[in-house]
């Protein structure tokens, strides 16, 4: 990823701009590194907020995100999501052993807030919103309330200690389910917003995914697909 689109590429953002829409992209961008011709603001998007770094997009607690072309630093510590196995000697069954992988600012919360702000700012004119959420891509990190919801449903389970890449996780099945449910919750909030602003009946929503079954990062697709 990150190989930049060429300056003259016809993107869906450009097409919508030409049709008179204000355009926004929120989430993960991998079509042009910062400073290149492939950044969202140079490829048809009036507004961008999210990840423009493939490595940091594999943790939900990144040290920075991008607000249009500007890097915005967060309070999270730098973590390499591909080289952070469980500490040597740590108890894999103790939730405290995984505490350092949960930091202060959860990127998806920040991205969703900006997305909803975009809807507010453009609700009285045509807008095109592309929401490229990283959920439920690994690493396995989700709001604790949703994780505990599924821990109660699934019971105890084998920890994921990082042996197949990405960050360790005490409750991998519960956390993967939590990520999906959290995304579903946010979709519901967006739809309710559209309804409250009397936009829903005049809005086309297209849901698609580029993430097929994955075997790494503790996601355990065979277990998920067995349900």
Language-model regions, residue ranges each:
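Formylglycine-dependent sulfatase
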Residues: 1-227
């Amino acid at each position: 990823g990150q190989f930049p689109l060429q300056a003259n590429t016809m993107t869906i953002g450009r097409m919508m701009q030409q049709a008179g829409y204000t355009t926004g992209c929120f989430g993960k961008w991998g079509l042009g590194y910062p400073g290149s011709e492939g950044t969202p603001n140079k490829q048809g998007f009036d507004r961008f907020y999210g990840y423009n770094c493939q490595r940091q997009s594999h943790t939900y607690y990144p040290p920075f995100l991008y607000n249009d072309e500007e890097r915005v630093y967060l309070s999270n510590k730098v973590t390499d999501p591909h080289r952070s196995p469980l500490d040597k000697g740590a108890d894999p069954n103790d939730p405290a052993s995984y505490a350092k992988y949960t930091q202060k600012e959860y990127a998806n919360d920040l991205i969703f807030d900006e997305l909803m702000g975009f809807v507010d700012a453009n609700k009285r004119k045509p807008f095109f919103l592309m929401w490229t959420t990283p959920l439920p891509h690994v690493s396995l990190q989700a709001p604790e309330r949703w994780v505990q919801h599924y821990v109660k449903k699934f019971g105890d389970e084998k920890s994921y200690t990082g042996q197949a890449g990405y960050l360790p996780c005490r409750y991998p099945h519960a956390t993967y389910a939590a990520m999906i449910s959290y995304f579903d919750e946010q979709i519901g909030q967006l739809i309710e917003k559209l309804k409250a602003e009397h936009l829903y009946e005049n809005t086309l929503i297209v849901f698609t995914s580029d993430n097929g079954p994955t075997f790494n990062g503790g996601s355990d697709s065979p277990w998920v697909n067995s349900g």
